[in-house]
């Protein structure tokens, strides 16, 4: 093994090992690797802190101020934010009160507009009177003869037919009733309201029994004629009494209808 061949192999192996070691240097031969890695880590860490660390505290602070604006947050940080909802609420409530108060005052001032000062004295202004046409007056008069009081559907229908409002129809009927009562009380009922004029208001009550009916029946009994029952309908409980009264009248007719022969004075004495 100590021959020339072995000596030649050893330098070849050493050269191969040195070549391989030169291709793959160790950490001791390359001192820049740790420094570069350290600088790279510091560079990236500094940028990471620069881009990430400021936003999080800012967002947390803003979120904290937003949520705790009215719950003991740092005073003076956002004065407009803490007072904005309260001021808005106060302004909104004040605005609502301003909107609600004018209708009340307007309602109170409505009667004052109808009062006018005449010679230093307040005088109420009367509304203009409604002028009815001849057709409307004739239709209202005909309806008044049928009924003095109208129901709501009837009043609405009549107002629609005549082109009037329901208030105008109601006021006309009220005035007409008061006028009729006044004339009837004074005994000055006009001809149009007489019973012969087919006025239902004058004939609303059932006809009273005539006074001469009893006299007529008594005269018929005296003349011996059987009285006939009247054509007017009578209640059922009155029929028995009337039949009994008629039968009594028929018994009374014999002594009246067949009187005895007159006796002369000479025959008696």
UniProtKB/Swiss-Prot annotation:
The keyword Transmembrane belongs to this UniProt entry's keyword annotation: no
UniProt feature, compositional bias: Basic and acidic residues: 1-10
DNA-binding annotation, residue ranges on this chain: 125-184
PROSITE patterns with a match to the protein in the record: HOMEOBOX_1, HOMEOBOX_2
Protein's cellular compartments: Nucleus
Main localization category: nucleus
Tissue spec: Expressed in the developing forebrain and fins.
Keyword vocabulary terms for this entry: Developmental protein, DNA-binding, Homeobox, Nucleus
Stretch list, region Disordered: 1-41, 191-242, 250-269
GO-annotated cellular components: nucleus
Origin superkingdom: Eukaryota
GO biological process: auditory receptor cell fate specification; camera-type eye development; cartilage development; embryonic skeletal system development; embryonic viscerocranium morphogenesis; endocrine system development; epithelial cell differentiation; inner ear receptor cell development
Biased composition (Polar residues): 15-39, 195-205, 215-225
Family that this chain belongs to: Belongs to the distal-less homeobox family.
Protein purpose: Involved in the development of the inner ear.
Protein name: Homeobox protein Dlx3b
Organism, as annotated: Danio rerio
């Amino acid at each position: 093994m100590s021959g020339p061949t072995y000596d030649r192999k050893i330098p070849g192996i050493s050269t191969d090992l040195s070549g391989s070691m030169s291709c793959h240097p160790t950490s001791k031969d390359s001192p820049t690797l740790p420094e570069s890695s350290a600088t790279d880590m510091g560079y990236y860490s500094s940028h990471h802190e620069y881009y990430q660390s400021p936003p999080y505290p800012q967002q947390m602070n803003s979120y904290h101020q937003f949520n705790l604006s009215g719950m003991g947050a740092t005073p003076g940080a956002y004065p407009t934010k803490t007072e904005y909802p309260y001021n808005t609420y106060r302004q909104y409530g004040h605005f609502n009160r301003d909107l609600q108060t004018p209708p009340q005052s307007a309602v109170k001032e409505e009667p004052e507009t109808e009062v006018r000062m005449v010679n230093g004295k307040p005088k109420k202004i009367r509304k203009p009177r409604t002028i009815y046409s001849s057709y409307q007056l004739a239709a209202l008069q005909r309806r008044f003869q049928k009924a003095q009081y109208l129901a709501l559907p009837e009043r609405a229908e009549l107002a629609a037919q005549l082109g009037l409002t329901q208030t105008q129809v109601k006021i006309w009927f009220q005035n007409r009733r008061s006028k009729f009562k006044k004339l009837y009380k004074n005994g000055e009922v006009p001809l149009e309201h007489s019973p012969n004029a087919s006025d239902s208001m004058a004939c609303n009550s059932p006809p009273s029994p005539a006074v001469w009916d009893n006299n007529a029946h008594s005269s018929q009994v005296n003349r011996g004629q059987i009285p006939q029952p009247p054509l007017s309908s009578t209640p059922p409980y009155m029929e028995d009494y009337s039949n009994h009264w008629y039968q009594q009248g028929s018994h009374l007719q014999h002594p009246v209808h067949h009187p005895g022969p007159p006796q002369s004075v000479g025959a008696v004495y």
